[in-house]
Structures are given as structure tokens and as C-alpha cells.
Amino acid sequence: MLDFEKPLFEIKNKIDALKESQEKNDVDLQEEIDMLEASLERETEKIYMHLKPWDRVQLARLQERPTTLDYISYIFDEFIELHGDRNYRDDPAMVGGIGYLNGQPVTVIGQQRGKDTKDNIYRNFGMAHPEGYRKALRLMKQAEKFGRPIFTFIDTKGAYPGKAAEERGQSESIAKNLIEMASLKVPVISLVIGEGGSGGALGIGIANRVLMLENSTYSVISPEGAAALLWKDSNLSKIAAETMKITAPDLKELQIIDDVINEPLGGAHKDVALQAERIKEAFTKQLSELEKLNGQELADDRFEKFRQIGEFKEQ
């Protein structure tokens, strides 16, 4: 349960208590239950229509939130995962392969978080090593060779900052991905499904179209990190989350991303099938527009998109 959901939890407890009492004592409490369920629905809508940035940060980090592989199973047909960077090893924190979107062959890549403690250790909590980014680039170049559109799912706190990752060239692997992705001659569509953290997110995020789920975040640093750096107090992370403009609605307004995909009431984890359906519709729409461009036009479109991000004022 998240902090802002406490009022909902209290109503749910009352509903459960009434249902238990109704069953145990063989009394009719359905009218009271119906009233509370209606109240729960109203309160849920009220809370989720007025989420604050820090609330969305909590939702983006939720363990129950659907992962890249969850969405792949719903959206793409006959997906085959491909492994390894052909240089060092396979990285379970970065998954990728080929499948079909509406009958069209495509390449799909994304960071993969774990579902539980054991899986998170195996997936390194979705924080890829250099070999993960090199695997992603290998699959992108393969997609370009065979003319397949590329879809990437961004879901990471950041690239893994460990000693071994740095020794194997973490920053170089990400930098190379940025350069190579900028010039790909096939459509590239990226979607932030949870946290989009810093260079770790950008390493698979240089796309013609960048989309975000309604309760995802995209930032150069975590709110806690920003608060610690700016104000020497990580407890000010709520203020940092608001100041940094890291939520999907804010980034859409700032023209850093192209579109926001709405989530089911309560978050993507409440109805994965519905969320996947909305993502598939958005992917199909964006791809149909990008397929009107030739290879060089796609590369130029991508380059110009990122050139236009940001502004400054002279005084």
C-alpha cells in the first residue's frame, strides 16, 4: 500500500469486515457494502485524478508494476528472445528479441526488473551492465539490416554503477548507443513504463517517438539524489520530485516526450491486459506515421527531435 492510498485501505477494511460479518452471522448487510463500494470507487477516482509528482514516483517504482516481458507477452506475437552481446556475456537486465506486431516483424528491446527478491538479484534490479547495452545495440543494428522497426521499453533506475561495469566500459557502451541510435534508418519508438533513470534510460531511448505511461517518470537523477545534492537533505525528495518536472504530464508539456498513454484507474498493475492494449494501439498509430518516411528521413527526424529539446533565456 502506498502512502496516498491509505484512505482507500481503510474503506476496503470496512468492506471486508462487513462481508465477513454477513457470512458468519447470516445477516443481510449488502446495502451497506454497496454504499461503501460506491464510496471506494469515488475516493479512488478522486485520489488518482489529483496525483502529486511524488505519488507518481511511488507508482513508477511499485514492485507489482508490469515489466517489459509482461507487456511483450500481450503485445507481440511469436516473440523469440535473443541473447548475448557477442563480446562478453548475456545480461538478464536487458532483454530483446524479434516478434510480430499486427503481423509485421519487429525488434523489441527493454530493461527487465525482477518479480521478487531472487528474480531481482538475477536481473540486477533492471540495471544493465555494458554488455546489456551492447546486446541492445547488436539487436538494433540487426533490425536495421533487415528493415525491422524497433520498440524499446525503458524501465530502470539507471545503468549499473558497479566497479566491474565501469571496468568494462559502461559510459562508452551507452555513448556508443546514443551515437548509433541517432543514425538508424528504421523507425524507433521508445516507451517509459516505470522509472526512466539518466543515461541508463537514454542508452535505449534515442527514438523517433518517445512515449510514457501516465504514472512513469523520466529524469537525469532520482528525487532523493537531487535533494541530497541541491539541499544536502534527501528527506526533501518530495519537493525535488515536483521541482524537477519528471512526470509524464510535465514532460509532455515541456515537449521532451511525444505522448502520454493513460493507465487504468489505480495504475498499470490493476489491469495489465487493458494497459497492454492501450500500448499496442499507441505503437500501431506511431508506427503507421513513421513508415511514411524513408531511412534518411527517419534518421533526420530523430536527430532534429533531440536537437530541439531544451531552451535557455539570455538576460
UniProtKB/Swiss-Prot annotation:
Pathway: Lipid metabolism; malonyl-CoA biosynthesis; malonyl-CoA from acetyl-CoA: step 1/1. InterPro entries: Acetyl_CoA_COase_a_su, ClpP/crotonase-like_dom_sf, COA_CT_C. GO terms for molecular function: acetyl-CoA carboxylase activity; ATP binding; carboxyl- or carbamoyltransferase activity. PROSITE patterns: COA_CT_CTER. Keywords: ATP-binding, Cytoplasm, Fatty acid biosynthesis, Fatty acid metabolism, Lipid biosynthesis, Lipid metabolism, Nucleotide-binding, Transferase. SUPFAM superfamilies: ClpP/crotonase. Residues 32-289 form the CoA carboxyltransferase C-terminal domain. GO terms for cellular component: acetyl-CoA carboxylase complex. GO terms for biological process: fatty acid biosynthetic process; malonyl-CoA biosynthetic process. Signal peptide: none annotated. It holds the Pfam family ACCA. Its EC number is 2.1.3.15. Component of the acetyl coenzyme A carboxylase (ACC) complex. First, biotin carboxylase catalyzes the carboxylation of biotin on its carrier protein (BCCP) and then the CO(2) group is transferred by the carboxyltransferase to acetyl-CoA to form malonyl-CoA. Acetyl-CoA carboxylase is a heterohexamer composed of biotin carboxyl carrier protein (AccB), biotin carboxylase (AccC) and two subunits each of ACCase subunit alpha (AccA) and ACCase subunit beta (AccD). PANTHER family: ACETYL-COENZYME A CARBOXYLASE CARBOXYL TRANSFERASE SUBUNIT ALPHA (PTHR42853), ACETYL-COENZYME A CARBOXYLASE CARBOXYL TRANSFERASE SUBUNIT ALPHA, CHLOROPLASTIC (PTHR42853:SF3). Belongs to the AccA family. This is Acetyl-coenzyme A carboxylase carboxyl transferase subunit alpha. It comes from Staphylococcus carnosus (strain TM300).
